[in-house]
Design a protein with these regions (language model features):
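Short, intrinsically disordered, charge-balanced linker/junction segments flanking boundaries
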Residues: 287-289
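Residue-level signature of outer-membrane beta-barrel architecture
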Residues: 278-280
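Periplasmic polypeptide-binding modules associated with outer-membrane biogenesis and secretion
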Residues: 1-263, 271, 275, 285
């Protein structure tokens, strides 16, 4: 297929150039032998471009300070190949750094590069720029907000918000800074939820805390799954978030029946083995067998 062949040629050339070989060319050579077509792609890489100088244009003193203090972990350094994948890894690294320091709405698209080639050389001067926060094109650009957690709410009914119910309609317990809302029966002890939670009230939002909570809650066998979302207190000017941990209860009981082959004193027979499990008998998500 000539279209597929040409498309592959373009993709290979693009990949090689993204590795820093900016003047690379890919030549196509085809051979027909015994009704079979053999395609060879010949890469003329040329000399790779390297980064001569790195600069940062970060028009936010707080964010600039975070980047500078963590510069020892940067993937960028002068003399490195001008490799697009490394540049993207650096954007991901800084994004993760900021998301773990309160920047709940930050993503890597707010970081862009400007690369200027140095005349008569195979070098580029690289500048990383920070774009202002802008959710939609028609929005006025603003500074990036640093969010703190106001409340951490544990909700034992995962469809509570979907039904349009108010939190006031549910029983609640306050435990170690957490607000636990339930109806009819609280099937997990408050201290268990506190022990498995990493999101802390009055602290900066940290994406790692969210992931750690997902991992930790996933070990509670009393739960089928957990969903965590965040709501802004005031979308216009607030920098506070409420964390909502929505829990879906798993089935408490299971019954399994196994047939085991036995061979005692030369007699081949069968023995029945029955196992009964209650996954939350003590409301601590224990398994009782």
């Amino acid at each position: 297929d000539p279209f597929v062949t040409e498309k592959s040629q373009i993709e290979i050339e693009k990949a090689v150039r993204n590795m820093g070989y900016m003047r690379a060319k890919v030549h196509l050579n085809t051979e027909t032998k015994k009704n079979k077509l053999k395609v060879n792609y010949l890469i003329e890489a040329g000399q790779p471009y390297t980064v001569k100088h790195i600069a940062y244009n970060i028009d936010d003193m707080v964010i600039n300070d975070y980047i500078e203090k963590d510069s020892a972990n940067s993937y960028l350094h002068e003399g490195m190949p001008f490799d697009v994948s490394v540049l993207d890894n650096e954007r991901n690294r800084i994004t993760k750094l900021l998301q773990n320091n309160g920047y709940y709405k930050f993503n890597k698209d707010f970081l862009v590069y400007q690369a200027d080639t140095v005349k008569n050389t195979f070098q580029v001067n690289l500048t990383m720029k920070l774009l202002p926060f802008q959710l939609r094109k028609e929005d006025v650009p603003t500074r990036h907000k640093q969010y703190t957690i106001r409340n951490v709410n544990f909700l034992t009914q995962d469809n509570l918000f979907l039904q349009g119910n108010s939190l006031e309609e549910y029983d609640s317990i306050h435990h170690e800074g957490l607000r636990i809302f339930y109806k009819d029966n609280l099937y997990l002890r408050p201290n268990v939820l506190a022990d498995f939670n990493y999101i802390q009230p009055q602290k900066l939002y940290r994406e790692q805390d969210v992931q750690n909570t997902y991992t930790s809650m996933g070990r509670l066998r009393a739960l089928k799954y957990t969903n965590i979302n965040f709501s802004e207190i005031n979308q216009n000017d607030s920098t506070q978030l409420d964390a909502n941990v929505l829990m879906t209860k798993g089935k408490n009981q299971s019954l399994s029946f196994e047939i085991e082959g036995t061979n005692s004193a030369g007699d081949l027979g069968a023995a029945a083995s029955m196992t009964f499990q209650h996954r939350n008998v003590f409301k601590g998500s224990e398994t009782f067998t």
